Amino acid sequence: MSKEGIKTEKFVGKTEGWDDIAVHGMGWYWDDLKVGQCFRTLARTITEADITMFVGVTGMVEEMFTNLEYIKSESKIGARPVPGSLVYCICEGLLMQSTMQRTGMAFLECDLRILKPTVAGDTIQVQAEVVETRGTSKPGRGLVRTFNRVVNQRDEVVATYNPLRMVKGRPQ
């Protein structure tokens, strides 16, 4: 027994038997989601390092993202901007961590709108609403569309998008 009074002997020092224990952090099944259901992700601050790595990996070596002196003299926003595609990628990462682990099957389409600039040091989160769910012709999967709002620490909506995804159904 542990000091909290919880039985621990069953698994202490053992590797077998864990397959019967529920996995936490699993994604949602399409048939568990209802139109109108809302959720939000954890928040994440976008750093200078995030921008540098993203620009390097993607080849987006635009001076607006790489030259701080140019940004100071030419930018109308007065700070290092975050590429809109990086904002989107971070949002998808936040959603993957909280809603799609082992259940997401395919990303099919979306309409992405960048509404306001995001700059280094901004903290964003996704606020999502389920707007469509339906089964497909093949059993065990369905389509889910959400309307996602990307909100910064000032409660400003900086982007919106409405992905359509193929998602696993609850196992029978």
For each predicted feature, which ranges?
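HotDog/MaoC-like acyl-thioester-processing domains
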Residues: 1-34, 114-172
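Hot-dog-fold acyl-thioester-processing enzymes
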Residues: 2-109, 170-172
